[in-house]
Amino acid sequence: MTTLAIDIGGTKLAAALIGADGQIRDRRELPTPASQTPEALRDALSALVSPLQAHAQRVAIASTGIIRDGSLLALNPHNLGGLLHFPLVKTLEQLTNLPTIAINDAQAAAWAEFQALDGDITDMVFITVSTGVGGGVVSGCKLLTGPGGLAGHIGHTLADPHGPVCGCGRTGCVEAIASGRGIAAAAQGELAGADAKTIFTRAGQGDEQAQQLIHRSARTLARLIADIKATTDCQCVVVGGSVGLAEGYLALVETYLAQEPAAFHVDLLAAHYRHDAGLLGAALLAQGEKL
């Protein structure tokens, strides 16, 4: 059975056909509409899926935000503008006349990464460090989504009570410090206004401030991982995202994690999948997991 998988992100929309063998075919991509209106998103989704839907038997959506009862929510509702409560599942069912499921994109990616692990692993946590910090938790070979869809939003746990205000409305979240956006926001002087990619480049050239910003991010993530180990007793943590997979970053996280007491140590692995983990994870869940 073929799944039409859709990934809804802040900057792009992607879709592909994924067969029972897990192979991705006919991948398409469009920019996410700049206008945060239901009509604009519906029109963009229609344009995205119309060439593919005749070849699929079901639809699986991986989306940024919180998915609750098939609709789109956010930790900070203001972030969604007019898309708050957008009925993702209902919209795609109307567009395609196919059965549809929806899940948070990081939760979907966690499920894809879990499938790529050694068969002896039953408990893992996936963390994506990119523009933001997200994640997903697999416990006893089951993906945890929670009754309200919030499970795995580990970027919004507390890192520093005196830290910067996070977009979710809390103060001092991991995301506000460790993410690409957080790294860039803390830059000062000649690095002020630089994005995370530029800061990583400057760090590689020996810039002291850039190196300090990256170390701050890695240290914050290591502390989060120690907390995750204490909370879930996971067997491994898989790290992905543009920051998480940046050259040398995971090694830094490992260095800081090694400074924690031994009980909080856990194996760290680089993500197997990159851009298409959300698509693949959503399709895998549609094939065999009830949400």
Swiss-Prot record:
Q: Which PROSITE patterns does the record cross-reference, listed alphabetically?
A: ROK
Detail which positions bind ATP: 5-12, 132-139
Keyword Nucleotide-binding belongs to the record: yes
Pathway annotation: Amino-sugar metabolism; N-acetylneuraminate degradation; D-fructose 6-phosphate from N-acetylneuraminate: step 2/5
Alphabetically sorted, this entry's keywords are: ATP-binding, Carbohydrate metabolism, Kinase, Metal-binding, Nucleotide-binding, Transferase, Zinc
Q: Which domain of life is it from?
A: Bacteria
The entry sums up its family as follows:
Belongs to the ROK (NagC/XylR) family. NanK subfamily.
Q: How does it assemble?
A: Homodimer.
What is the designated name of this protein?
Answer: N-acetylmannosamine kinase
* Biological source species: Escherichia coli (strain K12)
Q: Which gene produces this protein?
A: nanK
